Amino acid sequence: MKKITIAIDGFSSTGKSTLAKQLANHLGYIFVDSGAMYRAITYYALQNEYINQDLFNKEKLIKNLPQIKLEFQFNPKLGFAEMYLNDANVEKEIRTIKVSNYVSQVAAISQVRAKLVEQQQQMGKNKGIVMDGRDIGTVVFPTAELKIFMTASAQTRAQRRYDEMSSNSENVSYDEVLKNVQERDFIDTHREDSPLVKANDAIEIDNSHLSREEQFKIVLDLVNNI
């Protein structure tokens, strides 16, 4: 079967990465969680105190972008690739609510997006890739053979995220997670550079009431019909 590019976009906590992993594993494709890359840069900014509740030193972050090395390394025990920031595994650190609170602000910086889009396009130049994010079908791979746009209610997404974080023993309330989801929705859809929008040729899937297996079957059928 001819290898294709699959772009999965959508709002935060819609299960984009879960679906992308399922598809990549089934098809033998490369899986790239583009959000992990933005989270890693956000974590870097937090660690270097470029961003907090009171300030955001964008100039310093932009100046230091060349010093940031991002790569995915496959973990055979987990069955997927983990994010490495300057040769350190930060997969767990980038999934915290603290990083979630700032990632949309970091992702709105044009220089950050330019750096990561270039790296993402290099990853997918030979096709056979499933990548999820906010601008994959509109900016990174505008000619992708299959584009999916995932959505669900903010409350449903917040509950999923809360359950996930609670299972990882992170001390966070549902209301805090819901507020974060709603704030990220606003920033993601209103930023000047590559706002979150559905590509004209993307297929929208509202998975508010779909199981993981149901949505996987829907998308796999789409892949098989290309």
From Swiss-Prot:
Residues that coordinate or bind ATP: G10, F11, S12, S13, T14, G15, K16, S17, T18
Recorded name of the encoding gene: cmk
Provenance organism: Flavobacterium psychrophilum (strain ATCC 49511 / DSM 21280 / CIP 103535 / JIP02/86)
Q: Which GO terms fall under biological process for this protein?
A: nucleobase-containing small molecule interconversion; pyrimidine nucleotide metabolic process
**What domain of life does the native source organism fall in?**
Bacteria
HAMAP family associated with the record: Cytidyl_kinase_type1 (MF_00238)
Chief localization class? cytoplasm
Reactions catalysed:
CMP + ATP = CDP + ADP; dCMP + ATP = dCDP + ADP
Under which name does UniProt file this protein? Cytidylate kinase
* Top-level taxonomy: Bacteria, Pseudomonadati, Bacteroidota, Flavobacteriia, Flavobacteriales
